[in-house]
């Protein structure tokens, strides 16, 4: 019998949640995703030293202002890592907009255009790139504009049905609903464990997947942020799943049947009237878990972006 990773790939597009080239070569995913935390981690890999030096050299050529050089170097490093990943994966790389721009639509759009320009200048077409944006109201509005320009987006830090609905209504190419971080919140709140099938994160993604299929939204559902392989296997059949290295390794070394769990066959319904900003904010506010986890996720990515910039500043 084939290992579970091989079987899962027959049901779901498997994406590697890493910027580690050697690991990507090992597990052969279709796509790869990065975020500020993963870029920071990748920057510590000795083989990537040349990518950092190139980013710094480029930043110095763009501006005489030290603060701007730091920002430019961070953007170029994220793209440099993405370029290396694209030499390996046949599909797409997701590169994230600075989390500190999560509540600024215009700044998010400008940053996305800059990242796309850097990829384009390196010979990479838009259809191999996804721009990651936080699923705030402002991030979703930025995605709506970018999608119309041919810049496809990955809406991340998604913890609630309201966020998922708003993303679909905005025409986002893909969403990354988080599974493990939802589980973390419920375990801490209720002081109990959950089986994979009753895992609140799994239940959330399943509901979003079914809703999208029911209403014929083309937005891709890519489950993310897993804590164990049980969560992953309960979502077999999801459009895509982005998986970190430890769980990719565990799946590749485990045998046993993998069964499709997501496969909507119910009735189709007409799309509802799009949510207003007031409706979105109210529903997000009423979901304590999503409200807390969205804010926490943005803060965590901002901290790692700051650490990355501190490292780059020390080399400028």
Curated annotation (Swiss-Prot):
**Pathway(s) annotated for this protein in UniProt:** Carbohydrate degradation; pentose phosphate pathway; D-glyceraldehyde 3-phosphate and beta-D-fructose 6-phosphate from D-ribose 5-phosphate and D-xylulose 5-phosphate (non-oxidative stage): step 2/3
Q: What enzyme category does the UniProt record give?
A: transferase
**Key words, A-Z:** Cytoplasm, Pentose shunt, Schiff base, Transferase
Please write the reaction equations for the catalytic activity of this protein.
D-sedoheptulose 7-phosphate + D-glyceraldehyde 3-phosphate = D-erythrose 4-phosphate + beta-D-fructose 6-phosphate
GO molecular function: any one? Answer: transaldolase activity
Cross-referenced InterPro entries? Aldolase_TIM, TAL/FSA, Transaldolase_1, Transaldolase_AS
A Pfam cross-reference name: TAL_FSA
Q: Which GO terms describe its biological process?
A: carbohydrate metabolic process; pentose-phosphate shunt
Annotated compartments? Cytoplasm
Do you know which SUPFAM superfamilies this protein is assigned to?
Aldolase
E.C. number(s) listed in UniProt: 2.2.1.2
Highest taxon, organism lineage: Bacteria
What quaternary arrangement does the UniProt entry report?
Answer: Homodimer.
Entry function: Transaldolase is important for the balance of metabolites in the pentose-phosphate pathway.
Q: Which family does it belong to?
A: Belongs to the transaldolase family. Type 1 subfamily.
Q: What is this protein called?
A: Transaldolase
Gene behind this chain?
tal
């Amino acid at each position: 019998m084939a290992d579970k990773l091989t079987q899962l790939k027959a049901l779901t597009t498997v994406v590697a949640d890493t910027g580690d080239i050697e690991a990507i070569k090992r597990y052969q995913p279709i796509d790869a995703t990065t975020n500020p935390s993963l870029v920071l981690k990748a920057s510590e890999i000795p083989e990537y030293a040349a990518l950092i030096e190139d980013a710094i050299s480029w930043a110095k050529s763009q501006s005489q202002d030290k603060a701007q050089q730091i920002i430019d170097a961070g953007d170029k490093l994220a793209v440099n890592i993405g370029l290396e990943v694209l030499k390996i994966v046949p599909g797409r790389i997701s590169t994230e907009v600075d989390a500190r721009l999560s509540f600024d639509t215009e700044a998010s759009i400008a940053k996305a255009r800059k990242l796309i320009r850097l990829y384009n200048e390196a010979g990479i077409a838009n259809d191999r790139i996804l721009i990651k944006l936080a699923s705030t109201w402002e991030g979703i509005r930025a995605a709506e504009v970018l999608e119309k320009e041919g810049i496809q987006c990955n809406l991340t830090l998604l913890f609630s049905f309201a966020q998922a609905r708003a993303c679909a209504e905005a025409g986002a190419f893909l969403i990354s609903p988080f599974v493990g971080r939802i589980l973390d919140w419920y375990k801490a709140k209720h002081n109990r464990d959950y089986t994979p099938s009753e895992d609140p994160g799994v239940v959330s993604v399943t509901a979003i997947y079914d809703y999208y299929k029911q209403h014929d939204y083309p937005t891709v559902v890519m489950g993310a942020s897993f804590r164990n392989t049980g969560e992953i296997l309960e979502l077999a059949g999801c459009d895509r799943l982005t998986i970190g290295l430890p769980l990719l390794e565990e799946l590749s070394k485990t045998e046993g049947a993998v069964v499709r769990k997501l496969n909507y066959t119910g009735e189709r319904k007409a799309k509802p009237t799009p949510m207003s900003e007031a409706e979105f904010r109210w529903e997000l506010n009423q979901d304590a878990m999503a409200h807390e986890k969205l804010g926490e996720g943005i803060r965590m990515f901002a901290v790692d972006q700051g650490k990355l910039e501190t490292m780059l500043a020390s080399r400028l």
